[in-house]
Amino acid sequence: EILIGLVGSEMCIRDRFPVYKMIDTCASEFDSYVPYFYSTYEEENESIAEDRKKILVLGSGPIRIGQGVEFDYSTVHAVKTIRNAGYEAIVINNNPETVSTDYTTSDKLYFEPLCVEDVMNVIELERPDGVIASLGGQTAVNLAEPLESRGVTIIGTDCEAIEKAENRESFEKLLAALSIPQPKGQAVTNIEDGVKAAAAIGYPVLVRPSFVLGGRAMQIVAKEEQLRQYLKTAVEINEEKPVLVDHYIRGKEVEIDGICDGQDVFVPGIMELVERTGVHSGDSISVYPSYSISDHVKEVILDYTRRLGLGIGIRGLFNIQFIVDQEENVYIIEVNPRSSRTVPFLSKATGYSLADIATRVILGISLKEQGIDTCYPEEKSFWYVKAPAFSFAKLNGMDAYLSPEMKSTGEAIGYDRKFPRAMYKALIASGVKMQNYGTVMVTLADEDKEEALPLIRRFYEMGFNIEATVGTGEFLKAHGIRTRIRRKLSENSTEILEAIRSGYVSYVINTRAILSGVHYEDGLAIRRTAIENNVTMFTSLDTVKVLLDVLEEITIGVSPLYA
C-alpha cells in the first residue's frame, strides 16, 4: 500500500523489473567472473541470457526443521545430470549453506527468494525450456501451480499430478478407483465439522493441516476437548486451508522412494521404520532392507506403488508412506509427488543415484533406456540404518517427546553385515550415548506397561538397576523386577529430577498415553531434565527394543570395517 501510494498503482509497481548483479567473490581485489547473481533495482543488468537450451531447477530454500539439506542433495545431482545432457543448468535458491548455492555447481545461480514474483523475474529474463519443481522439496512443489498458471512450462511431475496427490478429495477418488485402502478420514473447514468427523471416524484421530512439510502442527488427539483446543489454537482452519482428520492406526510404518516414467515404476528399496505410526518418519530410525515385514507385504507395497505412480501421472521421483497393521493389512498414509528426505540415504544404501535417474526421466529418457528393466532389484546383503539427530539441548523448552511433528535436525548412517552393529554405528554417530551398565529410570503410561514389561526385564537381567515412578514401579515389582520407587512432581517431590541430575542414570524411558489422551506435567519436566543433563532418553518402546538388541549383541573391542 505504501508503494502504491508513492508510484500510483499496482501495475506501475509490476512494470518495474529488477536487474541482476554479479557477486564479486574477490571483493574487488582481483578480476573475477562467477555466474552468481542477486537482484536489485538499478539500471545495468549483468546477467546476460544465452541463446541455448536451458533448464531451471527450483531449490529447497532455507534449512529448517522438516526441510533440511537432504533436499539439496536432489537439486545438486539434478543439476549435474542436466549439464551432462548438454543443457544450461540454472538454479534459484536462497540458502548460502547448501551445495546448490556453490557457484561452481550450476551454469548460473540466482540467489533469490523462492516466491512467485522473484522466480518469475528470473524466468522472464532467462526464458528456460522447462522448470523442474519436483526436486526441491515441498517449497519448490508449492510454486508449480502459480508458475504454470503464468505460462511457465513445468517439466517432470506436472500440476495436475501434484493436485491428484496433495488434494484430499482428488486423492481419495484416485485411491477408490485403484482399490487401494487408506485410513478413514475427512477434510474439514471448521471446528464443528472437525468434531463431527472425529466422532464418526472414531478416536484417536490424527489431525494435520494440508500442504505442509515436516508434519508441522500435526497431532494425535484422543478426546473431543483436545480436538477443539487443537482446532482453535494450533492451526488456521477455513475453506482455503482445510484440516485433515484421519483415524489413527497403530502399526508398522514403511516408506519407499520410487521413480516413474509414465510406463514403468522403479523402486530401489523398501525402508522399514523402527518406531510405529505416531512418530514422524523424519524422527524415526529407518532401516534398509526391511527387517520384519513379510514377502507378501512387500509384494502388496510394490503393487500399490506401481498403481499410484502410473495413476497419479508421476514423471520422476515420488515418495509413499504406508501403514502395516497387525493383520498385515497395508494402508496408504500419503504420497509425496517429489523428492524426499530419504533420497540420499536410499541412494547410498542401494547404489542407485535416484536423483540422477529421475532427472533423466524428466528429460525424456525412459527407465528402460537407462538400463533399468526391473521394478524391485535384489536387496543388499548389508544392513543400512539411518538414525535421526536431535538438537533438544539447544532448543530451550522444546518437548523432546517424539510425535507426528518432526523435531530432528540431522541424521547419521551406519551399515554392517549384522543388523545390531549397523544400528550401533548409526546411533553412536547420531549422538546417542550408550552404556551397558548403570540405572534405567522408567515412567510409563498405563497403556504401555504390559508391552514394556519384557523390555524392562531384559535391562534387569543385564544387570541394570531399575528406578521408576510409583505406578510404574509397583507394576514392575508385582512382576518380579526389583525397583526403587521415586516420587512424582505431582507428589510435591523433585527426587526423580534430582536422580536424573546426579549423573548415575544411564537411560530414561518415558512414554505418555495416546489412547486415553491423558498427559501429565511430570513427563515434560522429566524429559527436559534428561536432555539438559545429557542423559539418553527414549519416548518410544520400539526404540528401546532395538537399543536392547544392540546392547546384547555389541561387545567393546575391535571389529572389521566392511568396505
Where are the regions a protein language model picked out?
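Short, solvent-exposed alpha-helical "recognition" segments
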Residues: 10, 14-22, 267
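ATP-binding N-terminal substructure of ATP-dependent carboxylate-amine bond-forming enzymes
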Residues: 21-180, 189-196, 415-561
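Glycine/aspartate-rich loop-and-adjacent alpha/beta segment that forms the canonical ThDP
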Residues: 219-222, 558-563
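Acidic/histidine-enriched active-site and ligand-binding environments that engage anionic O-linkages
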Residues: 196-205
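ATP-dependent carboxylate activation and anion-phosphoryl transfer catalytic cores
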Residues: 28, 49, 53, 72, ...
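Single conserved hydrophobic/aromatic residue that forms the stacking wall/gate
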Residues: 1-8, 13
